[in-house]
Amino acid sequence: MSDWNPSLYLHFAAERSRPAVELLARVPLENIKYVADLGCGPGNSTALLHQRWPAARITGIDSSPAMIAEARSALPDCQFVEADIRNWQPEQALDLIFANASLQWLPDHYELFPHLVSLLNPQGVLAVQMPDNWLEPTHVLMREVAWEQNYPDRGREPLAGVHAYYDILSEAGCEVDIWRTTYYHQMPSHQAIIDWVTATGLRPWLQDLTESEQQLFLTRYHQMLEEQYPLQENEQILLAFPRLFIVARRTE
């Protein structure tokens, strides 16, 4: 599991794209020239940006070669760069930085977010959506299984929190719109939940394990999911998935 799997990621493309659509709807910009899609993945969010601003120069950034290859194939009119978000520098100041479900993987948001704001033009916008599920059973159980099986903690850190992000971005010279939404995804089985998180949150826990260790981990994880996520009357499972949204407009 050394690289991301675009096919597995896109298995839930509609569910993953919905937050990007809702984030984009709150971006208060019309005619813009320069856009960056940070953590663009296979290009599903980039496609939304290109649809809204077809004349803009849109650059997708991702550290995964597989994701970049998929995005280039899907969107030949956009530019894609394989790079670390923290180190990438645009050729010119940006009108919009869009980051859908990517910045949660990076540390030290107290430095990262002001840095991203510094890359914007005056009145430019930083639009961010991050999964806020560190305390959800899906992610708590990852840590519990790892502890049971004596594996090191590979999970990401929790988000800084609504009040912290508001202060960080206000102090960086932005007007801030921030909100939190919990989606309830209908899942056909507990295995479907595993398929979902295997493409994202579960990757760090599995990537250094042998095949047999991965199987032991997933078997125990499946057992725990069954205990935490009961079936509905129609035998579907409701997967709660909170997400944090931020639209920050530079005023300085």
Swiss-Prot record:
Superkingdom to which the source organism belongs: Bacteria
A family per Pfam: Methyltransf_25
EC number in record: 2.1.1.144
InterPro entries: Methyltransf_25, SAM-dependent_MTases_sf, Trans-aconitate_MeTrfase, Trans_acon_MeTrfase_C
Keywords: Cytoplasm, Methyltransferase, S-adenosyl-L-methionine, Transferase
Reactions that this protein is recorded to catalyse: trans-aconitate + S-adenosyl-L-methionine = (E)-3-(methoxycarbonyl)pent-2-enedioate + S-adenosyl-L-homocysteine
Compartments it resides in: Cytoplasm
Gene Ontology BP term (one): methylation
Membrane-spanning residues: none
Similarity remark: Belongs to the methyltransferase superfamily. Tam family.
Function: Catalyzes the S-adenosylmethionine monomethyl esterification of trans-aconitate.
Record-given protein name: Trans-aconitate 2-methyltransferase
